[in-house]
């Protein structure tokens, strides 16, 4: 049996630079679709999923300008499509965040069922439950198509049957431009949920309670641009 032997007694010291949190970045970048203006996002981690999201946003019509290795400007005022290509969307698990962002901003979205890092079966039923509660009609197949009745989602009370980080973030994105107030009960509490809420609030959203099991989102008419720095990755810091 292989083993590691660790001899202690040597205090650690010094400094390291920690990358931006991956799980925050892969939600915040598609959340830029909700912004009616230019948003500058800093402390971007250098991972393939981020590069793919840049390509997807560009394909949808957004203007994506990479400023340096860790900063980007995204302008989604020129988005002309709510249907990212099958080949790109299915390559990353986090592509489901495009559903909440596009549905919230444009009232409809068609996104391929995601693949990517597949740690067993991770259904999106809680995402769909939240969208339907807010008045969306959702059909599922190789693609998930969601459309808001009347073109805009309505605030609703959403109780999560199981705690889901992805669903909490997706419903939060869908709700920021909805008509009325949305509450998410039994919400996930991870740091990247708080970071997404802070990003959206910095752009003009009204989200309270992120980081607790009850999140309240009061819908606003529009989000405007701004600058935001993604939190450091706690997993990288701990390892």
Please place each PLM-identified region on the residue numbering.
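Structural preference for solvent-exposed beta-strand-turn elements
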Residues: 1-239
């Amino acid at each position: 049996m292989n083993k590691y032997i660790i001899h202690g007694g040597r205090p650690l010291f010094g400094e390291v630079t920690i990358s931006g949190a991956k799980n925050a970045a892969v939600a915040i970048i598609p959340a830029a679709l909700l912004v009616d203006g230019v948003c500058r996002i800093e402390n971007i981690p250098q991972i393939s999923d981020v590069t793919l999201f840049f390509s997807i946003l560009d394909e949808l019509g957004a203007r994506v300008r990479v400023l340096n290795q860790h900063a980007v400007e995204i302008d989604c005022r020129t988005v002309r499509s709510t249907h990212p290509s099958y080949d790109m969307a299915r390559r990353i698990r986090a592509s489901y965040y495009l559903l909440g962002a596009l549905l919230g901003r444009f009232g409809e979205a068609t996104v391929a069922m995601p693949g990517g890092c597949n740690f067993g079966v991770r259904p999106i039923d809680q995402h769909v439950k939240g969208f339907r509660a807010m008045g969306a009609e959702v059909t599922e197949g190789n693609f998930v198509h969601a459309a808001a009745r009347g073109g805009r989602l309505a605030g609703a009370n959403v109780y999560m049957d199981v705690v889901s980080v992805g669903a909490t973030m997706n419903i939060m994105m869908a709700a920021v431009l909805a008509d009325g107030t949305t509450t998410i009960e039994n919400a996930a509490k991870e740091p990247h949920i708080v970071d997404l809420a802070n990003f959206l609030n910095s752009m003009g959203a009204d989200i309270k309670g992120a980081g607790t099991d009850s999140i309240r989102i009061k819908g606003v008419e529009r989000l405007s641009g701004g600058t935001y720095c993604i939190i450091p990755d706690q997993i990288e810091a701990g390892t």
